Curated annotation (Swiss-Prot):
Protein name, UniProt field: HTH-type transcriptional repressor NanR
Designated gene of the protein: nanR
Biological source species: Salmonella arizonae (strain ATCC BAA-731 / CDC346-86 / RSK2980)
Protein family per UniProt: Belongs to the NanR family.
Gene3D superfamilies: GntR ligand-binding domain-like, Winged helix-like DNA-binding domain superfamily/Winged helix DNA-binding domain
SMART domains, sorted: FCD (SM00895), HTH_GNTR (SM00345)
Function description: Transcriptional repressor that controls expression of the genes required for the catabolism of sialic acids.
Database matches in HAMAP family: HTH_NanR
Length: 263
C-alpha cells in the first residue's frame, strides 16, 4: 500500500473510530474558572511566577483572561487547595510550594466520607496497621539513640496522662507521631497525622470512666513496643505493634456497639 492509500485508509476508518469514542465518552465543556486555573497552574509550573512571588491582582487577571471576578476567584481557590498559592485577606495571591500536608488534605473530605461506609473504619484500621508495622520495624533497625530517647520521653508523658482522657489521647497521638518521624520522610508524617485524625474523629463518644482501663492497657503495650525497639528486634517490635493496634481496634469496636445499644 502506497503512502497516499494508507493515509486514505486511515481517513476512511477515523470517523467510525471517532464515533465509537464519542459514544463512550461524552464531550465535557470546561468552565471558565477551570481554564483560568489550568493556565495559571502552567504559568506557575513554568516558573513565570516564582515561589513567594505575588500573582497579578484580581482585576488584572480578569482583564488578562477576559473573564469575570467569580471565575478568577474560583480559579485561585482551586490553586490554593492544590497548595500552589496562599491567599490572605486583603493581599494578592502568593505562589507557594505544595507540601505533603497539602496533598493529604486534598483527600481528607473523601476519606471522612469513606469512613462512614460499611467497613470503612476497618479498612482504615488495616491501612494504619500495615503502615505502622513498617514504621516500628524501621525504628528497631535504624532509630538513633536520640530518637529512642524521644520515644522514651513520649512514653513518660503517656504514663503521666493515664487519669486524664483528653491528655492521654494527645500523648498517645504524640507517641505514635514520634514513631512516624523516625524515617525522616515528610510524606510519612502527613499520612500518619491524617490517618489518626480521621480514625479518632470516627470514634464514638465514651464516658471517661470507661476509658481509664483502656488507657492503661495502651500504655503497657507502648512499653513493650519501645523495649523491642531498644533491643533492635524488628520482629518483636512488629508483633508488639500488631498486638497493640488490634487491641485498640477491638476496644473501640466494643465501645461503638455499646454506644449503639444505649441510644
Amino acid at each position: 500500500m502506497d503512502v497516499m492509500n494508507a493515509f486514505d485508509s486511515q481517513a476512511e476508518d477515523s470517523p467510525l473510530t471517532i464515533g465509537h469514542s464519542l459514544r463512550r465518552r461524552p464531550l465535557a465543556r470546561k468552565k471558565l474558572s477551570e481554564m483560568v486555573e489550568e493556565e495559571l497552574e502552567q504559568m506557575i509550573r513554568r516558573h513565570e511566577f516564582g515561589e513567594g512571588e505575588q500573582l497579578p491582582s484580581e482585576r488584572e487577571l480578569m482583564a488578562f483572561f477576559n473573564v469575570g471576578r467569580p471565575s478568577v476567584r474560583e480559579a485561585l481557590a482551586a490553586l490554593k487547595r492544590k497548595g500552589l498559592v496562599q491567599i490572605n485577606n486583603g493581599e494578592r495571591a502568593r505562589v507557594s510550594r505544595p507540601s505533603a500536608d497539602t496533598i493529604i488534605s486534598e483527600l481528607s473530605g473523601m476519606a471522612k466520607d469513606f469512613l462512614t461506609h460499611p467497613g470503612g473504619i476497618a479498612h482504615f484500621e488495616q491501612l494504619r496497621l500495615f503502615f505502622e508495622s513498617s514504621l516500628v520495624r524501621y525504628a528497631a533497625e535504624h532509630a538513633t539513640d536520640e530518637q529512642i530517647a524521644l520515644l522514651t520521653k513520649a512514653l513518660e508523658i503517656n504514663s503521666q496522662s493515664l487519669d486524664d482522657n483528653a491528655l492521654f489521647i494527645r500523648s498517645d497521638v504524640e507517641f505514635h507521631r514520634v514513631l512516624a518521624e523516625i524515617p525522616g520522610n515528610p510524606i510519612f508524617m502527613a499520612i500518619h497525622v491524617a490517618l489518626l485524625d480521621w480514625l479518632i474523629a470516627a470514634r464514638p463518644s465514651v464516658p471517661d470512666r470507661e476509658l481509664h482501663e483502656h488507657n492503661n492497657v495502651s500504655y503497657q503495650q507502648h512499653i513493650v513496643i519501645v523495649d523491642a525497639i531498644r533491643q533492635r528486634d524488628p520482629d518483636k517490635a512488629d508483633r508488639a505493634l500488631q498486638t497493640h493496634l488490634n487491641s485498640v481496634s477491638a476496644t473501640w469496636h466494643a465501645f461503638g456497639k455499646k454506644s449503639q445499644k444505649t441510644r
